[in-house]
Amino acid sequence: MTLQTFKSTDFEVFTVDGLEERMSAIKTNIHPKLEALGEQFAAYLSKQTDENFFYHVAKHARRKVNPPNDTWVAFSTNKRGYKMLPHFQIGLWGTHAFIYFGLIYECPQKVETAHAFLEHLNDLKTNIPNDFVWSIDHTKPSVKLHKTLETEDLQKMIERLATVKKAELLVGIHISPEEFSAMTNEQFLAKIESTMQSLLPLYALCNR
C-alpha cells in the first residue's frame, strides 16, 4: 500500500474562512486524496462483496453561503449516487477523520434494514468493536461510543431509524488529529480496511 493519504495538517482546511476559499482549499488539498482512496477501496469492497462498488467524492454543490465543515468519499453499488443506498464513507471533519457504514435519511431501505438489525441486536452489541461510534446525524460530529451503550440504547437508535422519517444511523470509527499524526500512511490504510471488514456484516444484513 503506497497510496498517499491525509496529513495531520489537512484537518486545518476547515479553518479557512469563506465558501469559495474553503472549497478551493478542499478541492486542492483533500479531493485528490479522496479520489485515490475512492479508487482503492471501491475495488476492495467490490472484491469483498462480489458486487460492483463505485465511489462518490462529495461536491458540496448545494452550498451557496456557508462553507462545509466536513468532506468525504462515499461508496455504493450505484454509479450515479449513494444517498439512496446503504453505503460506506471515508472523510474528515476539523476534529477527526471518520470511516463509516450507514444509511442516511434519503435511503428507502431504512425500515427493512432496521428490522434486520433488530433481529440481530445482540450480535451487533457483541460484535461491534468497543471503540466504534454511532451517529444519528451525518451532518453533526457528535457520536455515541459503542462500549458505553446498553443493548436498550442501541435498540432505540435502530427503532428510530424505522419510525422517524429523517432518521439516520451510521457506525464506524473516529481518528483524532493527534492519533492521526502518530500513524503511518500504511497504518491508516490498514485501519480503513479493518474497519470496513468489521462493518461488512451490517452491509450483508441490508442485502439479505
From Swiss-Prot:
Pfam families tied to this protein: DUF1054
**Domain of life of the native organism:** Bacteria
The coiled-coil segments of this chain are none
Name the HAMAP family on file. UPF0637
Q: What protein family does this chain belong to?
A: Belongs to the UPF0637 family.
Name listed for the protein in its UniProt record: UPF0637 protein BA_4170/GBAA_4170/BAS3872
